Amino acid sequence: MKSWLLLLGTIGWVTAGDVLFIPSTLYPVHAQTMSVLARELAERGHKVTWLEIGPERSDIVLHQQVSREFWPAQFGDRTLQEIYQFKNHTSHSELWNPQYTNENEQTTGWLASIRLCDSVLSRSKSKFDKMVEKQFSTVIVDDLYNSCGVLMAGLKKSVYIYWSMTGLRTESAWANQSPSPPSYLPVAGTGLTDDLTFSQRLYNVASYFKQLYIHQHIVQPRIDAVFQKYYPGVESTFEIERNASINFVNTPPIFDFSRPYMPRVNFIGAIQCRKPKELPKEFTSWISAYPDGFVVLSTGFTVQWNKSPEHIRQAYLDTFKYLPNLLFIWQTGLPNSSNLPSNLLVKPWLPLQDLLGHQKCRCHVSHGGLNSVIESVYHGVPVVGVPLTSRGYDNLLRITARDSGVMVEKSEFSGEILTAAINEVIENEKYKKEMLIFQDMVIDVPYTELYHAAFWVEFIERHQEVPHARSGADHLNFLQYFLVDVIAFFFFVIFCTLSIIYYTIRTVFRTIRSVVNGVRGVPKIVSRGKKNN
């Protein structure tokens, strides 16, 4: 018996790893998503360390066995503080402006993360060095707005997982060598589907090279400057990103438009999704009073409702009044008041998955946040999308392209339009039917995405590297990757061949012409001679 216990203990010791998580702190949803995998690994017996670098420690609740570290850092810029820390920047009220798409969100986020990284290294480089010296079997790094996370992965020289909290973006696909043909694959932020006209393909190609240029020639050089400032000689950001052992993507495999990708890319979207739990009595008492069901309205961490224009809030309230037979459960920080419609339940935060999984949930009004949209698919609830940013628009396109919901543009937004959209989704059975088909394709797999993600972490711990998952493209430059050198060589050969043929033919014709002219010219000369005689 003792020998069996010893064997089991040895097996547990061998298989359990030491994992370091480094999430981005600019957007809480990133850490919230990563915490799900951290909890799973801790429950499997792994030693998990969680490192946050930012102006404030997040409110994310971690598993009790997760070792948590927080290193304070400052932006050193008032505008960045207002955007990410105080959330009182004008951009929060501009979200509802039809012309505002927040297309510079990604560049601004990276520049903010560079300042945070510079700040923490200037204050706590000794802490950083000690963390580098610690032995971890795997490092898991958020691939957005996480400069110090990239540096940690590069300095440790250990295997690491690069986790995209969005879909597989252009620059991420370039780093892991997954082909992203702009001929049919829409670039993030373009608002396009995979059915492109000629003019749309022109725009898509321009957007493709623009995103690569911004990341590789604006963002990465600034990150490298900070790296070289504190660690001269360290690898470039480009090389560190390319050296990731595994890439996680925060979308289900069939959520996005069909695309090619490398074997080291694993789609683990819906990792946070689960079966619904029983709702608190406060919700059930409201829901039971409305036989026609209820509608959920959520905006996640994105919208500061106290910054929204009055006419926007009034449009929502008008919608609730137009549909008195439905209960509306609205996630908003606005205070309760006697002026609110009687069919409205207001909460600052919602048990969203428990509500979406309830049998009386009729539809989900979403701003287009990736996690909330995926949760709608997972629970089979059609969506009415009100996109506030270009990223949200892209996420909702994946729903509307499959007839699993409708979208209301900001430029058309009103109480009447929103009411019509909700009625359309609820009364037209097509949307529910298509969403259930979409749901079935996402969940009809022999494992959960959480199990899938945990498997790959443990796979990397056991094997350390996956050489067969890498391609020869890792060693190619831009011109070689797109076969510019080969195409140029072919054109050169064709040009030389055609030139040789041309000059050969011209020479032959000139020779023939001169011979002919020579033959014709002899009699004339002779006749003249005779005449002179």
From Swiss-Prot:
Residues listed as glycosylation sites in the UniProt record: 88, 243, 336
- Provide the catalytic activity annotation: glucuronate acceptor + UDP-alpha-D-glucuronate = acceptor beta-D-glucuronoside + UDP + H(+)
List all membrane-crossing ranges. Answer: 481-501
Q: What keywords are assigned to this protein?
A: Glycoprotein, Glycosyltransferase, Membrane, Signal, Transferase, Transmembrane, Transmembrane helix
- What does the record say about its membrane topology? Single-pass membrane protein
A single Gene Ontology CC annotation of this entry is:
membrane
Instruction: Give an example GO molecular function.
Output: glucuronosyltransferase activity
Q: Where in the cell is it found?
A: Membrane
Q: Which leading EC class covers this enzyme?
A: transferase
EC annotation? 2.4.1.17
Provide the leader sequence positions.
1-16
Tell me if Cytoplasm is a UniProt keyword of this record. no
InterPro entries, A to Z: UDP-glycosyltransferase (IPR050271), UDP_glucos_trans (IPR002213), UDP_glycos_trans_CS (IPR035595)
> Hey, which family's this protein in?
Belongs to the UDP-glycosyltransferase family.
User: What is the protein name given in its UniProt record?
Assistant: Putative UDP-glucuronosyltransferase ugt-58
Q: Which organism is it from?
A: Caenorhabditis elegans
